[in-house]
Curated annotation (Swiss-Prot):
Quaternary structure and interacting proteins, as annotated: Homodimer.
NCBIfam families, sorted: hisC (TIGR01141)
Presence of keyword Transmembrane helix: no
Modification N6-(pyridoxal phosphate)lysine occurs at: 218
Biological process annotations from GO: L-histidine biosynthetic process
Lineage, highest ranks first: Bacteria, Bacillati, Chloroflexota, Dehalococcoidia, Dehalococcoidales
UniProt name for this protein: Histidinol-phosphate aminotransferase
First-tier enzyme category under EC: transferase
UniProt catalytic activity: L-histidinol phosphate + 2-oxoglutarate = 3-(imidazol-4-yl)-2-oxopropyl phosphate + L-glutamate
Keywords of the record: Amino-acid biosynthesis, Aminotransferase, Histidine biosynthesis, Pyridoxal phosphate, Transferase
GO molecular function, one term: histidinol-phosphate transaminase activity
């Protein structure tokens, strides 16, 4: 019997593009020690107390706190935002998805500023919304006038990454305010906040259309545990809490975040080291005549290849045990992105790139 399951699947997903995630280190075929510079993780790892807590934890058979009450209390102290305005999720990705589920009816529009974080488009289309792209300029800065011109009665959300990923481009608070003044609900993604020190939190009382996302994946060394949080107007936080699955932050992640917040000064010291190393990496990459690095305020640097093919360089680096991200989308043709790691990671990358340029 032939059974056609496909006829029951949503027709709008037939040509849906999945997300191309980074390769897990254990899948890399190399005898070399892996230097993982492809996913903007903190290579210093989690705080020592997190690792200790994980080894001693004995409640994996118990469901976690569905409201993440202790995490939210600690985050309230950290951010200065009221507990009832904080919502936690399985990475900020889940919160992006939930926001789109909350705001989007089929055909509603979401303004996106590519090249930028791919999950804005991913979840918009998954939730039957329409992406309206307002491209950045050649230096990857946003075009506020073009955003204004793109707004229609169907516009429900604007996504702004601050700073932008994958380009590392900064955006000023004044520019964000100009976007907020347009009156559309706006999500400011501060995934890399700890590396910049710039936040829009103090503007939340003035702008009821401002929503902020953050994550523990980049600065806190918890990428594998998937924890993010958002700072929202009370009405949005209430709706998100209602539609969010209750156990999305698992019990191991809950325990790890608690320890991270208690040891945040330790983790912020690793952030300072990464910021210092970022400057060294940028300076050294600038010396290669075949690479054009772009200024970055995050924990990675985007480079355009002026000679050669980015995909071939990525494969050559992988054969040496060095994992980097390759991009070839519009406005990012023939580009590589290097996460900033420890000094020894930078040394290994620079040595490998130097050998290729010889």
């Amino acid at each position: 019997m032939t059974y056609n399951l496909k006829k029951y699947i949503r027709t709008d997903l037939e040509d849906f593009d999945g997300y191309s995630a980074c390769k897990a280190p254990e899948l890399v075929k190399t005898s070399k020690q892996i230097i993982k510079l492809d996913a903007n993780e903190n290579l210093y790892g989690a705080a020592p107390t997190v690792r200790q807590a994980m080894s001693e934890f004995n409640q994996y058979h118990i469901y976690p706190d569905a409201t993440q009450s202790e995490i939210r209390r600690l985050l309230s102290e950290y951010t200065g935002v009221a507990v009832e305005q904080i919502v936690c999720g399985a990475g900020s990705d889940q919160l992006i998805d939930l926001l789109l589920r909350l705001f989007i009816n089929p055909g509603d529009e979401v303004i996106n500023c590519p090249p930028t974080f791919a999950m804005y488009k991913f979840y918009t289309e998954l939730n039957r919304g329409k992406i309206v792209n307002v491209p950045r300029d050649a230096s990857y800065n946003i075009n506020i006038a073009a955003i204004n011109n793109a707004i229609t009665p169907q516009t429900k959300l604007i996504f702004i990454a601050a700073p932008n990923n994958p380009t590392g481009t900064a955006i000023s608070k004044e520019e964000i305010r100009q976007i907020l003044d347009l009156g559309v609900p706006t999500v400011v993604d501060e995934a890399y906040y700890e590396f910049t020190g710039q936040t829009m939190v103090s503007d939340m009382s003035k702008y009821p259309n401002l929503m902020i996302l953050r994550t523990f994946s980049k600065w806190a060394g918890l990428a594998g545990l998937r924890v993010g949080y958002g700072l929202f107007p009370p009405i949005i936080a209430d709706y998100l809490s209602r539609i969010k699955d209750p156990y999305s932050v698992n019990i191991a992640a809950d325990a790890a975040v608690r320890q991270t917040m208690l040891q945040r000064e330790y983790m912020l010291e690793t952030v300072k080291k990464i910021v210092n190393e970022r400057q060294r990496l940028y300076t050294e990459l600038s010396k290669f005549g075949w690479l054009k690095p772009y200024p970055s305020v995050a924990n990675f640097i985007l480079c355009k290849l002026l000679k050669g093919k980015a995909k071939e360089v990525q494969h050559e680096l992988e054969s040496k045990g060095i994992l980097v991200r390759c991009f070839d989308a519009p406005m990012m043709e023939n580009c590589l992105r290097f996460s900033v790691g420890k000094p020894e990671d930078t040394d290994g990358l620079l040595k490998a790139l130097g050998e290729m340029g010889e």
